[in-house]
A protein has these predicted regions:
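One-carbon transfer enzymes
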Residues: 1-146
Protein backbone atom coordinates (compact mmCIF):
# COMPACT_ATOMS: atom_id res chain seq x y z
CA UNK A 1 0.00 0.00 0.00
CA UNK A 2 1.11 3.53 -0.76
CA UNK A 3 0.44 6.62 1.27
CA UNK A 4 1.38 10.24 0.77
CA UNK A 5 2.51 12.97 3.16
CA UNK A 6 1.78 16.51 1.93
CA UNK A 7 3.68 19.12 3.91
CA UNK A 8 5.10 22.59 3.33
CA UNK A 9 7.77 21.79 5.92
CA UNK A 10 11.01 19.97 5.10
CA UNK A 11 11.18 18.21 8.47
CA UNK A 12 8.26 16.01 7.45
CA UNK A 13 10.62 14.17 5.08
CA UNK A 14 11.88 12.45 8.23
CA UNK A 15 8.29 11.71 9.25
CA UNK A 16 7.74 9.99 5.92
CA UNK A 17 10.89 7.87 6.35
CA UNK A 18 10.03 6.97 9.94
CA UNK A 19 6.48 5.92 9.03
CA UNK A 20 7.81 3.75 6.23
CA UNK A 21 10.09 1.93 8.69
CA UNK A 22 7.47 1.58 11.44
CA UNK A 23 4.60 0.46 9.22
CA UNK A 24 6.36 -1.29 6.30
CA UNK A 25 4.13 0.75 3.96
CA UNK A 26 5.46 3.02 1.26
CA UNK A 27 5.20 6.74 2.05
CA UNK A 28 5.91 9.35 -0.60
CA UNK A 29 6.08 13.05 0.16
CA UNK A 30 5.02 16.24 -1.60
CA UNK A 31 6.53 19.48 -0.28
CA UNK A 32 5.21 22.01 -2.77
CA UNK A 33 1.70 22.94 -3.85
CA UNK A 34 2.75 22.81 -7.52
CA UNK A 35 3.31 19.05 -7.06
CA UNK A 36 -0.22 18.47 -5.76
CA UNK A 37 -1.86 17.70 -9.10
CA UNK A 38 -4.21 14.94 -10.22
CA UNK A 39 -1.61 13.78 -12.74
CA UNK A 40 1.06 13.45 -10.04
CA UNK A 41 -1.33 11.76 -7.62
CA UNK A 42 -2.43 9.28 -10.26
CA UNK A 43 1.22 8.32 -10.79
CA UNK A 44 1.64 7.73 -7.03
CA UNK A 45 -1.83 6.21 -6.49
CA UNK A 46 -1.97 6.78 -2.71
CA UNK A 47 -4.55 5.09 -0.51
CA UNK A 48 -4.61 8.15 1.77
CA UNK A 49 -3.03 11.59 1.58
CA UNK A 50 -2.01 12.93 5.01
CA UNK A 51 -1.74 16.73 5.09
CA UNK A 52 0.59 17.16 8.06
CA UNK A 53 1.40 20.84 7.53
CA UNK A 54 -0.29 22.41 4.55
CA UNK A 55 -1.08 26.10 4.17
CA UNK A 56 -2.73 25.92 0.76
CA UNK A 57 -6.25 25.12 -0.35
CA UNK A 58 -6.70 21.49 -1.33
CA UNK A 59 -8.51 21.32 -4.69
CA UNK A 60 -11.95 19.72 -4.62
CA UNK A 61 -11.03 17.33 -7.43
CA UNK A 62 -8.32 15.92 -5.14
CA UNK A 63 -10.26 15.53 -1.88
CA UNK A 64 -13.24 14.03 -3.70
CA UNK A 65 -11.08 11.44 -5.50
CA UNK A 66 -8.66 10.58 -2.66
CA UNK A 67 -9.10 10.14 1.06
CA UNK A 68 -7.43 13.27 2.44
CA UNK A 69 -6.72 13.62 6.15
CA UNK A 70 -5.73 17.02 7.53
CA UNK A 71 -3.99 17.68 10.85
CA UNK A 72 -5.09 20.85 12.66
CA UNK A 73 -3.61 22.20 15.91
CA UNK A 74 -6.84 22.91 17.76
CA UNK A 75 -9.58 20.97 19.47
CA UNK A 76 -11.94 21.32 16.52
CA UNK A 77 -14.46 22.78 15.98
CA UNK A 78 -12.78 25.37 18.22
CA UNK A 79 -10.07 27.30 16.38
CA UNK A 80 -11.09 26.55 12.82
CA UNK A 81 -9.14 28.49 10.20
CA UNK A 82 -5.59 29.63 9.62
CA UNK A 83 -2.69 30.19 12.04
CA UNK A 84 -4.03 27.97 14.83
CA UNK A 85 -0.76 27.73 16.77
CA UNK A 86 -0.18 31.48 16.75
CA UNK A 87 -3.78 32.19 17.76
CA UNK A 88 -3.64 29.74 20.67
CA UNK A 89 -0.37 31.19 21.99
CA UNK A 90 -1.63 34.79 21.69
CA UNK A 91 -4.75 33.81 23.68
CA UNK A 92 -2.63 32.26 26.44
CA UNK A 93 -3.52 28.60 25.94
CA UNK A 94 -1.11 26.11 27.56
CA UNK A 95 -2.25 23.07 25.64
CA UNK A 96 -4.50 22.06 22.80
CA UNK A 97 -5.52 19.00 20.87
CA UNK A 98 -4.17 17.94 17.54
CA UNK A 99 -7.17 16.99 15.40
CA UNK A 100 -7.05 14.62 12.42
CA UNK A 101 -10.02 15.25 10.15
CA UNK A 102 -11.30 14.40 6.72
CA UNK A 103 -10.86 17.16 4.16
CA UNK A 104 -14.15 18.75 3.12
CA UNK A 105 -15.27 21.74 1.11
CA UNK A 106 -15.66 23.86 4.25
CA UNK A 107 -12.35 24.61 6.01
CA UNK A 108 -11.58 22.44 9.04
CA UNK A 109 -15.14 21.11 9.16
CA UNK A 110 -14.93 17.48 8.01
CA UNK A 111 -15.55 14.42 10.18
CA UNK A 112 -12.89 13.93 12.85
CA UNK A 113 -10.88 10.70 12.93
CA UNK A 114 -9.22 11.35 16.28
CA UNK A 115 -7.75 13.98 18.60
CA UNK A 116 -4.69 13.84 20.84
CA UNK A 117 -3.51 16.26 23.53
CA UNK A 118 -0.61 18.56 22.58
CA UNK A 119 1.34 20.76 25.01
CA UNK A 120 2.06 24.32 23.89
CA UNK A 121 5.06 24.67 26.22
CA UNK A 122 8.36 25.82 24.75
CA UNK A 123 9.32 27.49 21.51
CA UNK A 124 7.34 27.22 18.28
CA UNK A 125 10.03 24.86 16.96
CA UNK A 126 9.67 22.60 20.02
CA UNK A 127 5.88 22.58 19.70
CA UNK A 128 6.05 21.74 15.99
CA UNK A 129 8.54 18.93 16.69
CA UNK A 130 6.18 17.44 19.30
CA UNK A 131 3.27 17.85 16.91
CA UNK A 132 5.19 15.99 14.21
CA UNK A 133 5.86 13.08 16.58
CA UNK A 134 2.20 13.08 17.60
CA UNK A 135 1.10 13.10 13.95
CA UNK A 136 3.24 10.03 13.40
CA UNK A 137 1.50 8.08 16.17
CA UNK A 138 -1.91 9.33 14.99
CA UNK A 139 -1.22 8.22 11.40
CA UNK A 140 -0.26 4.77 12.68
CA UNK A 141 -3.49 4.59 14.72
CA UNK A 142 -5.54 5.61 11.68
CA UNK A 143 -3.83 2.98 9.52
CA UNK A 144 -4.38 0.27 12.14
CA UNK A 145 -8.11 1.03 12.14
CA UNK A 146 -8.38 0.63 8.35
Amino acid sequence: MKYLIASNKNWHKELSKSLQIKTAYQFDIINDETELTLERLESISPQIIFFTHWSNTIPKEIFTKYECIIFHMTDLPFGRGGSPLQNLIIRGHKDTKLSALKCSEEYDAGPIYLKEKLSLAGTAEEILFRASKLMESMIIKILLEK
